[in-house]
């Protein structure tokens, strides 16, 4: 990945259906939506949201992956911070 393509970082806050944490994480990982193991991560959190997903890359690629995250059948809502 070109260093210029990493210039954008997005924090995607995800609320999922109760009890579906494992299914959601497996879904996201199996679809390859985290592409840079050094920069990107998916953390379970407590509070209004269940996961924080950090995405890095070109804005066009981040947009595409956020749309794919939202397509997960376990997602209730998302908030994205860029």
Task: Please identify what each model-predicted range represents.
Residues 1-82:
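A compositional/biophysical signature of low hydrophobicity enriched in polar/charged and small residues
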């Amino acid at each position: 990945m070109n260093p210029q393509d990493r210039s954008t970082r997005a924090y995607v806050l995800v609320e999922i259906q109760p009890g579906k944490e494992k299914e959601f994480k497996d879904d996201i990982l199996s679809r390859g939506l985290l592409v840079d193991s050094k920069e990107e991560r998916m953390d379970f959190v407590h509070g209004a949201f269940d996961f924080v997903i950090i995405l890095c890359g070109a804005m066009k690629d981040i947009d595409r992956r956020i749309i794919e995250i939202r397509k997960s059948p376990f997602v209730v809502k998302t908030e994205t911070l860029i």
